[in-house]
């Protein structure tokens, strides 16, 4: 009561404005816009409009669009792309010298494996001849499994640094990345890296680039990304050689479609036209989108609309990667940066890579960009939670990772042995392995992954065609005989580069894997480029590991889709007491059946607990048994209390035990623990 009286006296003594503001406060709060995001995010978005521009933003706003340069670094695995990116960031003052290694390799799996998995971007400011230039760098993956990342990166680039290791020369993925960049019309700058190595032969590497790619090597730059030697010569070359616009040829049929740019990269005065290049998930901000602005400009608070979904969003924050997320008040035409919406996207599927956005009200004035062609999954696995209660957590984790990697396909499926799970499609086995690592590291998911398999094409006798990715959908024996005309499997054209001394072993390996030789070239007296057409099923069966073993680690491999070819394809099943275990079934070529069948039954026997009755483990194709193992039952000693001379009683007890086992085997279910499947399916 005393407290209430004191408050009343204070209010009566206070200025009228104070009391009025206090009485109005609930009304203001009740009618304020409600944003479902963190208070930190709201404070950040509100302060963007009021706080003065930072020195960085003042420098960027003073740079005209003609002084923008967007470029990427493409090369074979381990040729030094990420290390060179570090040196360029240090040279432009974006990071402190020696402050970090592989700054743009942000994922744990990238640092563990020492490879780039995700294309990462960073903006830099570089002063050349007294003028500031805004440079946008993309560090791309080198492995063939992540070529979709490389392809998407070209959408925001006008040129590329083609990097070659001076000690190794041109490798398989150097060739693949060159043709991909060349097809998109990118301006290519030859760069020879690791010239400080004792084994470096920069002149030989230059000669290879000149002969293989017909590049003008007079302007090639010799650098050592590790020591920083000559790195300062790269950026002036980028500014002089790479235009502020990109050319995308009209007849290109690569993964990227046309972006039809033959004029400067954009006009700030036109209505907003924005391309969604990538996206990822943040636990506080939700879905964050990496975008390229083609026309117009975008600020926090504006409302935009998606051409793909028709959904409208309010922009919560815009910024650039410098190298981490750095908020800005505006993104202009020609820039690449990030945005997130407030409120955010409700579902990860709303962020469609290749989608075009514009301001609400300008939909009819803006022509949407063509976007990206979806890459085709080539390798499929089934994923199940170790604990069935964690299915929803696994689903959320997969959806968040797919937001960051749209080349993965996801379908729900169920197994009698392992319960509810997912059928996942990937571009290759390394792609699959990296995804599995990210699920475990970033989301703490405990999962069971089946061995990788490839799709097959069923041609029915009525002329219809069907692509099968799951063994559960493979036709049964009767259907195969009566309704199926032909079964085809996918082939790839593999390009292998290696020293000439290993030629015999490599040819032997390819022939053993049902390969057909297409060409053989010597691009130096000691280096060979060998092209083979191989079944994709053989390629995913650790072909690269066998190739490395045959060449002592000196070989490199690249591949592309070739064609479907007829093959003797069957479904191999594992039977436990004549009941099929659906989680283990695989679609394989008949030549692999005996080896895999024996391997399966031997390995599965090690992980099945003994029962009170005999457990028979078999590998079968249709009704034909390929291999068999038996798990002996526990045996009770029924003769323990019997006198040695009572032969008839002895015989009677043994017969009774035998009959009991027969009945138990007929009605008893084999209990197979989850951990048995986990151990069996482990690599």
UniProtKB/Swiss-Prot annotation:
The enzyme class is: hydrolase
Q: Name one GO cellular component term.
A: mitochondrial inner membrane
Chain residues that bind GTP? 75-82, 139-143, 193-196
**Membrane topology field:** Peripheral membrane protein
Family indicated by similarity: Belongs to the TRAFAC class translation factor GTPase superfamily. Classic translation factor GTPase family. LepA subfamily.
Q: What biological function has been recorded for the protein in this entry? A: Promotes mitochondrial protein synthesis. May act as a fidelity factor of the translation reaction, by catalyzing a one-codon backward translocation of tRNAs on improperly translocated ribosomes. Binds to mitochondrial ribosomes in a GTP-dependent manner.
List the NCBIfam families. Answer: lepA, small_GTP
Family annotation (PANTHER family): TRANSLATION FACTOR GUF1, MITOCHONDRIAL, TRANSLATION FACTOR GUF1-RELATED
Name by which UniProt lists this protein: Translation factor guf1, mitochondrial
Q: What gene is this protein translated from?
A: guf1
């Amino acid at each position: 009561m005393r407290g209430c009286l004191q408050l009343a006296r204070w209010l009566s003594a206070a200025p009228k404005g104070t009391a009025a503001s206090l009485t109005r406060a609930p009304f203001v709060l009740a009618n304020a816009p409600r944003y479902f995001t963190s208070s930190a995010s709201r404070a950040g978005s509100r302060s963007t409009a009021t706080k003065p521009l930072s020195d960085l933003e003042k420098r960027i706003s003073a740079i005209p669009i003609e002084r923008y340069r967007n470029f990427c670094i493409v090369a074979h695995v381990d040729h030094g792309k990420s290390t060179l990116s570090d040196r360029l960031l240090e040279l432009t003052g974006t990071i402190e010298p020696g402050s970090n290694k592989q700054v743009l390799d942000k994922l744990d799996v990238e640092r563990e494996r020492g490879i780039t998995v995700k294309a990462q971007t960073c903006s830099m400011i570089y002063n050349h001849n007294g003028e500031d230039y805004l440079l946008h760098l993309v560090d791309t993956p080198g492995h063939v499994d992540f070529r979709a990342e490389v392809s998407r990166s070209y959408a925001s680039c006008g040129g590329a640094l083609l990097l070659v290791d001076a000690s190794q020369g041109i490798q398989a993925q150097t060739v693949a990345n060159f043709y991909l960049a060349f097809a998109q019309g990118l301006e290519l700058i030859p760069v020879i890296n690791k010239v400080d190595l004792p084994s470096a032969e920069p002149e030989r590497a230059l000669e290879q680039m000149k002969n293989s790619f017909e590049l003008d090597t007079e302007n090639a730059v010799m650098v050592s990304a590790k020591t920083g030697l000559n790195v300062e010569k790269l950026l002036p070359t980028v500014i002089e050689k790479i235009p502020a616009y990109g050319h995308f040829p009209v007849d290109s049929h690569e993964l990227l479609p046309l972006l039809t740019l033959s004029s400067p990269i954009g006009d700030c005065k036109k209505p907003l036209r924005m391309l969604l290049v990538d996206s990822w998930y943040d636990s506080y901000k939700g879905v964050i989108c990496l975008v390229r602005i083609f026309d117009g400009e975008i600020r926090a608070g504006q409302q935009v609309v998606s051409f793909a979904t028709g959904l409208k969003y309010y922009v919560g924050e815009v910024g650039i990667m410098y190298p981490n997320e750095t908020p800005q008040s505006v993104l202009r035409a020609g820039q690449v940066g990030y945005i997130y919406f407030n409120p955010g996207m409700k579902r990860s599927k709303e962020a469609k890579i290749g989608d075009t956005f514009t301001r609400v009200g300008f939909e009819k004035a803006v022509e949407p960009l063509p976007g990206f062609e979806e890459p085709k999954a080539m390798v499929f696995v089934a994923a199940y939670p170790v604990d069935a209660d964690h299915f929803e957590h696994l689903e959320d984790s997969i959806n968040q990772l797919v937001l960051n990697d749209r080349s993965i396909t996801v379908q729900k499926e169920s197994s009698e042995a392992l319960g509810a799970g997912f059928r996942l499609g990937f571009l290759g086995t390394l792609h699959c392995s990296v995804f599995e690592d990210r699920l475990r590291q970033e989301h703490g998911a405990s999962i069971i992954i089946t061995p990788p398999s490839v799709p097959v094409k069923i041609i029915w006798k009525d002329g219809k065609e069907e692509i099968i990715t799951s063994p559960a959908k493979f036709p049964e024996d009767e259907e195969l005989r009566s309704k199926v005309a032909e079964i085809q499997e996918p082939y790839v054209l593999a390009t292998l580069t290696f020293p000439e001394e290993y030629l015999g072993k490599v040819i032997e390996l390819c022939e053993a894997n049902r390969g057909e030789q297409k060409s053989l070239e010597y691009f130096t007296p000691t280096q060979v480029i060998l092209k083979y057409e191989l079944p994709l099923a053989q390629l995913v069966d650790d072909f690269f590991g066998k190739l490395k073993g045959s060449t002592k680690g000196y070989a490199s491999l690249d591949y592309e889709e070739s064609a479907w070819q007829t093959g003797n394809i069957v479904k191999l099943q594992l039977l436990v007491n004549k009941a099929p275990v659906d989680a283990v079934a695989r679609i394989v070529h008949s030549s692999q059946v005996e080896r895999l069948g024996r391997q399966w039954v031997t390995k599965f026997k090690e992980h099945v607990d003994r029962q009170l009755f005999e457990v028979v483990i078999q590998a079968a194709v249709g009704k034909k048994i390929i291999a068999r193992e038996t798990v002996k039952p526990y045996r009770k000693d029924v003769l323990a209390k019997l006198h040695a001379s009572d032969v008839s009683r002895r015989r009677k007890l043994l017969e009774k035990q035998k009959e009991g086992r027969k009945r138990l085997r007929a009605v008893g279910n084999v209990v197979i623990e989850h951990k048995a499947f986990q151990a069996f399916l482990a690599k």
